[in-house]
A protein has these predicted regions:
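N-terminal membrane/targeting module of cytochrome P450s
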Residues: 1-26, 88-108, 133, 335
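Cytochrome P450
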Residues: 2-18, 75-82, 146-158, 168-191, ...
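Cytochrome P450 substrate-recognition site 1
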Residues: 32-52, 57-152, 176, 181-188, ...
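Cytochrome P450 C-terminal beta-domain/meander region
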Residues: 66-71, 223-230, 245, 250, ...
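Hydrophobic, repeat-rich solenoid/adaptor surfaces of innate immune receptors and signaling proteins
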Residues: 83-87, 163, 189-193, 227, ...
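Cytochrome P450 heme-binding "Cys pocket" and the immediately downstream C-terminal segment
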Residues: 102, 280-321
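Conserved cytochrome P450 K-helix/beta-meander segment immediately N-terminal to the heme-binding cysteine loop
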Residues: 231-259
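Cytochrome P450 heme-thiolate "Cys pocket" and heme-binding signature region
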Residues: 257-287, 312-313
Length: 335
């Protein structure tokens, strides 16, 4: 009891602070000797946690990149991380040094659950024979089931029709289309795997969408745990040294002087190199068919009294739009 009174308490507090500062100093020495790229000075114990706005990570990283350069360091607690920004540096890391940067940090929950390397799936798996085998298997299975083929296009077109019907049912109202879009995407995967789709009210489909959403959030929570290298794809998609109007939707970015489509090397929403998205052909097909179908059938507007959708993303995997409302009105034929 005596120990917790007055001077005893003070001595204990001072001892604890000195102990923490010493441990912190040991970690800092490791950082100094390892010669990390520049970055903001980390706080003892917390690292740079208070210097980044977790609710708007892309903007925080954007400001840091302008201050410290395209490759800079941050510390999450005592864990050092290197953030890579803009086309040139990202290409160098993902493509030129692809072999050295294709690994993924161990996932603590996998260890706790005793998940074996062969059961880690593709996205989070370490770069090794198990990942290679799972990736090859996934690509060939997706192809067998129709990825990149006409048969899948029919499923996606059919689903786009159902999506349009769901929009029609709520035409003229202020809606958040997220749930409908997620159900349509889940149905495409269901078409691939089960060769059938589900009605949007079907409890099974609703459960599936919820599970996918939850698992994605979990993943984003675990990624930073062991991550030392963070590839900031947003900084490539909005690279001011590459795009004419980097912060605007500007279709001319992808058109030549004659109005023909041109590919742009900085357009890499599916990443690049060995760990690039393997579902890209399917995702592109879905985006094209869903968008064209919706835009042909409806005029979209911001409902009266609602703000314009924000261009800031919600920082998860993948980055998602912040909630927004829109109003879809059925187009008159020929307009
Ligand atoms: C618009 C939709 C999509 C976007 C923007 C997207 C984006 C990405 C990105 C940026 C990565 C790299 C992640 C990393 O570096 O760790 C990735 C990986 C991956 N994506 Fe996608 N993706 C999309 C749709 C899909 C679909 C439809 C599938 C499945 C059919 C899929 C399956 C995968 C897999 C399995 C990986 C891990 C690849 C590996 O680590 O080897 N994605 N995706």
């Amino acid at each position: 009891m005596e120990l917790l009174n007055g001077t005893g308490l003070w001595s204990m507090a001072i001892f604890t602070v000195i102990f923490i500062l010493l441990v912190d100093l040991m970690h800092r020495r490791h950082r100094w000797t390892s010669r990390y790229p520049p970055g903001p000075v980390p706080w003892p114990v917390l690292g740079n946690l208070l210097q980044v706005d977790l609710s708007n990570m892309p903007y925080s990283l954007y400001k840091l990149q302008h201050r410290y350069g395209d490759v800079f360091s941050l510390q999450k607690g005592w864990k050092p991380m290197v953030i890579v920004n803009r086309l040139k540096a990202v290409q160098e890391v993902l493509v030129t040094h692809g072999e050295d940067t294709a690994d993924r940090p161990p996932v603590p929950i996998f260890k706790c659950l005793g998940v074996k390397p062969r059961s880690q799936g593709v996205i989070l798996a370490s770069y090794g024979p198990e990942w290679r085998e799972q990736r090859r298997f996934s690509v060939s299975t997706l192809r067998t089931f129709g990825m990149g083929k006409k048969s899948l296009e029919e499923w996606v077109t059919k689903e786009a029709g159902h999506l349009c019907d769901a929009f029609t049912a709520q035409a003229g109202q202020s809606i958040n289309p997220k749930a409908m879009l997620n159900k349509a995407l889940c149905n495409v995967i269901a078409s691939l795997i089960f060769a059938r789709r589900f009605e949007y009210e079907d409890p099974y489909l609703i459960r599936m969408v919820k599970l996918v959403e939850e698992s994605l959030t979990e993943v984003s929570g675990f990624i930073p745990e062991g991550t030392t290298l963070i590839i900031n794809l947003s900084s490539v998609l909005k690279d001011e040294t590459v795009w004419e109007k980097p912060h605007r939707f500007h279709p001319e970015h992808f058109l030549d002087a004659q109005g023909n489509f041109v590919k742009h090397e900085a357009f890499m929403p599916f990443s690049a190199g060995r760990r690039a998205c393997l579902g890209e052909p399917l995702a592109r097909m879905e985006l094209f068919l869903f968008f064209t179908c919706l835009l042909q059938r409806f005029s979209f507007s911001v409902p009266v009294g609602q703000p314009r959708p924000s261009t800031h993303g919600f920082f998860a995997f993948p980055v998602a739009p912040l909630p927004y409302q829109l109003c879809a009105v059925v187009r008159e034929q020929g307009l």
